[in-house]
């Protein structure tokens, strides 16, 4: 059984998180994707990895996601970035940590470098999707969809069996969080893993991230026949192998 905790950020905001404590040591911080949560295979797999390798672990659900409080349509990249930074500061304190960002989580992870420059030791990106709101959504919306979202402030999009709401404020906030023009000079281990058959986010997004990090020991791993989530047993093992290389 997985034990979840809640951290009260404000009088009305509670964030659910997974935590394995390590008083003086390195942590692994997992940041999940858009409309995801902590019930999937990745956070639990990385939690087990951390326990076996004598590491601390932290994963959280942004507001409006999973069992955290809040309404999804009130959220945006700025808010979710801030929530992640607050809970990292509260739980990890001054310990060093490795960031793992899955899909949108990689965008949130890149944003953490402005808060924790001296603490971040490495970064593992999985199907990384920075700037997806503008580049993969807004720029590809038909004219009618754009007109509807401008008029109503929201539109419901279908993706496979799911339907999710996209707000105008979310799109606009995404534009304030551009990262591809950034330059990050930290000397860290950086590995980006991307499925060759990722139908949600093209591998070029991982290539673009490599250009952001100027002094990193960096590599791109393209998983043959890999999908966007990379959540099968063998792919999770690959991710954990790459994480171990980042740590060592």
Give the location of each predicted region.
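N-terminal cap/lid segment of alpha/beta-hydrolase-fold proteins
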Residues: 1-22
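Gly/Ala-rich beta-loop-alpha elbow adjacent to hydrolase catalytic centers
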Residues: 101-109
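The alpha/beta-hydrolase serine catalytic core
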Residues: 11, 107, 119-217, 222-223, ...
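Catalytic nucleophile-loop/oxyanion-hole region of alpha/beta-hydrolase
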Residues: 66-91
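Conserved alpha/beta-hydrolase
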Residues: 43, 47-69
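Alpha/beta-hydrolase active-site loop signature
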Residues: 35, 62-67, 130, 227
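Short substrate-entry loop that stabilizes the transition state in hydrolases
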Residues: 35-41
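Short beta-strand element of the alpha/beta-hydrolase
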Residues: 25-33
């Amino acid at each position: 059984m997985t034990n979840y905790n809640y951290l009260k950020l404000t009088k009305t905001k509670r964030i659910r998180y997974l935590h394995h404590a390590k008083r003086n040591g390195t942590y692994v911080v997992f940041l999940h994707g858009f409309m995801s949560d902590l019930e999937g295979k990745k956070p639990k797999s990385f939690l087990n990895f951390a326990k076996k390798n004598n590491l601390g672990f932290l994963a959280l659900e942004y507001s409006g996601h999973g069992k955290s409080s809040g309404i999804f349509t009130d959220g945006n990249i700025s808010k979710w970035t801030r929530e992640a930074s607050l809970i990292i500061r509260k739980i990890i304190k001054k310990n060093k940590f490795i960031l793992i960002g899955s899909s949108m989580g990689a965008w949130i992870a890149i944003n953490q470098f402005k808060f924790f420059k001296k603490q971040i030791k490495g970064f593992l990106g999985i199907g990384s999707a920075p700037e997806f709101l503008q580049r993969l959504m807004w720029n590809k919306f038909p004219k009618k969809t754009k007109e509807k979202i401008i008029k109503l402030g929201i539109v419901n999009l279908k993706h496979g069996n799911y339907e999710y709401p996209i707000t105008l404020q979310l799109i606009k906030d995404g534009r304030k969080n551009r990262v591809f023009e950034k330059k990050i000079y930290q000397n860290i281990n950086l590995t980006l893993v991307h499925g060759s058959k990722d139908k949600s986010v093209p591998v070029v997004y991982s290539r673009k991230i490599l250009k952001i990090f100027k002094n990193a020991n960096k590599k791109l791993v393209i998983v043959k026949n890999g999908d966007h989530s990379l959540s099968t047993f063998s792919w999770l093992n690959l991710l954990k192998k790459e994480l171990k290389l980042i740590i060592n």
